[in-house]
């Protein structure tokens, strides 16, 4: 392990001894091999100190080269992997964590072209944290910003499905779970503020246009979300047409019919909307493609519910 002594020359290039130069700036105890290095600790260091430490590990860091090369990467971990290929890095053990986390911190500080995968992963988690605090609006704001980054990457790399994007995204997250949570959160907010239905429509339309080869359950989920948003905005004809199109593609998708009818039940308590919902449920019952008895029973229950209220 590379150990920096107090009397060694400071890696910042000043020519001074480490104890007389940057020792007080470095809040991390690099000399303790048992001490873990955390991202929050590195964020507290100034840029000069971070770069000095990278140079100490024999990484010939150059501002202009770093900024120019960022466009070739999406992950700070992948960037640091290439440093290991290019330089004879002396970091060992827990010190190796410093390398990729330093790349992440410098990425955030020195460029605003795009967020790295690690930052996007953290923002997605931050959105979930906001949801746990019942701050749905902040969660949506964070997540829609992340989606914009993903859109740029999808267009640049030519991905056609969410599965393709997930394979290249450096994270343990399942993007399919996050995508459906984002869509549902926009819908829930739309029930309180109709502007969010417009955001839901835009998100759903972007997803379907950019990632049309995603798995069927995602196409179904996002398509019904778009159609439902139109109905709640009062554009019922457009919403109905979109439900009809998705059900033409998936004729035995019972829950597509149920979700369609439910939107009219949720709109208001008017007799006309109840009749509309009943017509949709009965349309599904008349559909010869729906054969499962459990699905048929659910539809019959829905018909009884609207008839009795």
PLM regions with names:
Residues 1-48, 95-101, 255:
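Acidic/negatively charged segments and metal-coordination signatures
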Residues 29-79:
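Extreme N-terminal leader/anchor segments
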Residues 92-104, 138-162, 192-205, 232-239, ...:
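Helix-turn-helix repeat elements of alpha-solenoid scaffolds
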Residues 93-98, 167-192, 234, 266-276, ...:
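Alpha-helical linker/edge segments of TPR/alpha-solenoid repeat scaffolds
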Residues 109-114, 149-175, 189-194, 205-219, ...:
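Flexible helix-coil transition and linker loops at the boundaries of alpha-helical arrays
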Residues 146, 207, 246, 283-284:
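Canonical positions in the second alpha-helix
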Residues 279-309:
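Terminal, low-structured helical/coil segments at or just beyond the last alpha-helical repeat
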């Amino acid at each position: 392990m590379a150990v920096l002594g107090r009397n060694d020359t400071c890696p910042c290039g000043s020519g001074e001894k480490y104890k007389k130069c940057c020792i007080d700036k470095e809040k991390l105890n690099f000399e303790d091999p048992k001490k873990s290095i955390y991202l929050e600790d590195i964020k507290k260091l100034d840029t000069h100190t971070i770069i000095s430490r990278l140079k100490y590990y024999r990484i010939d860091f150059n501002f202009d080269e770093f900024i120019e090369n960022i466009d070739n990467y999406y992950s700070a971990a992948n960037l640091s992997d290439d440093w290991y290929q290019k330089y004879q890095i002396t970091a060992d053990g827990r010190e190796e964590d410093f390398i990729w986390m330093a790349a992440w911190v410098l990425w955030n500080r020195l460029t605003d072209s795009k967020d790295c995968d690690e930052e996007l992963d953290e923002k997605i988690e931050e959105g979930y944290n906001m949801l746990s605090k019942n701050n749905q609006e902040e969660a949506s704001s964070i997540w829609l910003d992340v989606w914009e980054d993903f859109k740029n990457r999808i267009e640049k790399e030519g991905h056609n499905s969410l599965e393709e994007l997930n394979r290249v995204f450096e994270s343990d997250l399942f993007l399919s779970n996050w995508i459906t949570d984002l869509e549902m959160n926009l819908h829930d907010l739309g029930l309180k503020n109709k502007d969010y239905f417009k955001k839901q429509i835009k998100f759903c339309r972007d997803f379907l246009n950019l990632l049309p080869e995603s798995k069927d359950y995602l196409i179904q989920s996002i398509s019904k979300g778009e159609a439902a948003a139109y109905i709640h905005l009062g554009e019922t004809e457009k919403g109905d047409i979109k439900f009809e199109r998705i059900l033409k593609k998936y004729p035995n998708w019972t829950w597509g019919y149920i979700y369609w009818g439910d939107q009219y039940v949720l709109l208001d308590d008017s007799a006309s909307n109840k009749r509309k919902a009943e017509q949709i449920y009965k349309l599904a019952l008349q559909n010869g493609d729906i054969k499962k008895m459990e699905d048929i029973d659910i539809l019959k229950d829905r018909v009884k519910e609207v008839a009795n209220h």
